[in-house]
Amino acid sequence: MQKIASSQETILYRLGSPCYKNRFYILTGPGSRELLARPEVVGFPCYSALLEETVAALRYLSSTGMGGDLDILTILRGGLNYPLEEACALAGIRVRDMHFLSCERIIRDHVITGLDIRYEKLRPTSGRVLAIGDIIASGATLRKCLD
């Protein structure tokens, strides 16, 4: 993981590995750190905590040539909503298409044992950036959604 940009308390990292064909970025800032420390925060407070730092990261990526048109994949999980579409609009990035995965954790005896995809609208366009906004602690849900 390589730090590629920082602004005040917000840091943007790029994940790098010879086995990756795609580019992956991780954003951390005051809002995302607050959500990790207070997982009970859901709904609009969750959404608004992430907006400013997401706009800053998108503006940075756009200034380095990563802007332009893109598709968005939103992973719907109860009260956790990532503000990627609004952040793109504020950063001047055009969203061409929206894709969705709705998932629900499978819990047995108070242990998360899997993930059930309840709804899927995922038809990415070849040659276009697919931006995924998600709140990741371990990455397990994201990996299962993309499998």
Predicted regions and their residues:
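PRPP-associated nucleotide enzymes
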Residues: M1-D147
